[in-house]
Amino acid sequence: MPLAWIRRDRQCIGPVRPPVFLLYREQARSYNGGRSGPATMPTTAIIVPCRLESTRFPRKLLHAIKGQPLLVWVAERIAAQAPEFPLYFAVDDESLRATVAVRGFSAIMTSPGHASGTDRLAEANRVVRADFVINVQADEPLVTGAQIRELARLVAGAAPMATLATPFRRAADFLNPNQVKVVVRGDGRALLFSRSPLPYVRDRGGAVDDAWVAAHPCYKHLGLYAYRADLLERFASLPPGRYEQIEKLEQLRVLENGYDIMVGLTEDPTIGVDTPEDAKRFEEALDAQG
């Protein structure tokens, strides 16, 4: 299936694809043993894994931005952008649970000992029992409904996992190891994720400028995922991959164990709040919106 773009006006550019309800109907048929007739429609839920402590920005989810904790900005954004999906917060501390619960959001207490957000997600879904799980990061306050719906559409297809990417526009970002790159096959499946510049431009000795980056398929991976429940449950038991351990990118575990990851492309910007400086950038974005 070829790639398609989501514009800021949320119109799809590119080949016409089956509506998401048709994909869900086909999935429902498979859940019903291939039989026609009444079937239990598979469910999709958004789960946000939340960890109180953070190395670069301690207790960042409770950091106040314009008088409101970052986690609340994220919760309200998701609820407003994608109200059609049930929303849960998988938390590891009572302070996080109380922060979302007092505002009417559902919170699930999970073990504080999880090694990754994906493990926390899997524990929470044993309570939620969704067939498809969309993972929005707790520090991504500008996620859009179009992005969430694209993830739901992709994971309802053949691949057990989906994620999003956006084109690089600046060489400095492309060369930054903190901005993860993804190489995408012609059918939309991920070929490789890396912190290194991908592709490496041999004819230029690796030297690139903004114009070159903007004109070539250089994609930044966004930390938004969707999982089929069976893969999510299996993830924790998969052996860590060699490249995962080198790059410190857990999505490589999925590829190294032979599973496909579909990649959707989006032009919507995101701001991951990893540092106090990022929090200031988000506040500036709020000011710009008025």
Model-derived segments and their meaning:
Residues 7, 14-16, 22, 28-29, ...:
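Short, low-complexity intrinsically disordered segments enriched in A/P/G/S/L with frequent Arg
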Residues 42-91:
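N-terminal glycine-rich phosphate-binding loop and ensuing alpha1 helix
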Residues 46, 87-89, 162, 190, ...:
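Hydrophobic/aromatic residues located in beta-strands of well-ordered beta-sheets
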Residues 88, 94-153:
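Short phosphate-binding loop-to-helix
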Residues 91-92, 143, 227, 274:
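A conserved hydrophobic position in a structured secondary element of the catalytic/binding core
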Residues 144-239:
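Conserved core of the sugar-phosphate nucleotidyltransferase
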Residues 207-290:
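Conserved alpha/beta core of the MobA/IspD/sugar-nucleotide pyrophosphorylase nucleotidyltransferase superfamily
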